[in-house]
Design a protein with these regions (language model features):
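Extracellular/periplasmic carbohydrate-active domains that bind, remodel
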Residues: 1-189
Length: 189
């Protein structure tokens, strides 16, 4: 697994991860931040490419409500309501996920959750194939308040300006392939 964050007070930019194999991990590609990390906590121009995953609980997680700090379970960090943007507000700009095969997933194909007051600017998923384990185990997709235990969920996405889905296949989930909330533009190619 590759994790970016959660303590990224100076930001993370221009990072490219490629040619990886993840097996038997709880998450595959995980980004975590939260309110309070600061306005310099900017994540931008990060790409993940040519990655194979097998038996991963949730292959793609971008979590703007990460709660594993002493103050991580406060109302300020966990509130799903838009709060004022100030010097404590982090931001997520552009991410690209390309040429990724995730098989035998368990909990969710993706769990992407930006802040309502500082939406993720742009996420691109290109040439992505997600399939689920026949005996999928339930679990929690992201470490945040209000994320309930589940299994075989599709692409859960929220608080995004632009979501680009180019040749994305989600096979074997229970329910909708894409569950979007507060996403301004979904572009399917």
């Amino acid at each position: 697994a590759v994790t970016v964050g959660s303590e990224i007070a100076a930001g993370v930019m221009d990072v490219h991860i490629k040619d990886c194999l993840f097996m038997n991990t709880d998450r595959g590609l995980r980004v975590k931040t939260r309110r309070g990390r600061g306005k310099l906590s900017v994540l931008d121009d990060i790409s993940f490419e040519n990655i194979d995953m097998d038996n991963v609980m949730t292959p793609f997680v971008v979590n703007s409500f990460y709660f594993c700090d002493p103050d991580g379970k406060t109302e300020y960090v966990g509130s799903k309501k838009p709060l004022p943007v100030d010097d404590r507000t982090p931001s997520i700009k552009k991410f690209t996920f390309k040429n990724i095969n995730a098989k035998n997933c368990h909990v969710a194909g993706t769990y992407i959750c930006g802040l309502p007051e500082s939406k993720i600017e742009e996420l691109t998923f290109e040439n992505i194939n997600i399939t689920y384990a026949d005996n999928a185990k339930s679990g929690v997709a992201a470490m945040m308040l209000g994320c309930d235990e589940a299994s075989r969920q599709g692409m859960i996405v929220s608080n995004i300006n632009t979501l680009i889905l180019d040749n994305v296949k989600v096979t074997g989930c229970d329910g909708e392939e894409i569950v979007a909330e507060n996403v301004d533009n979904i572009i399917k190619k």
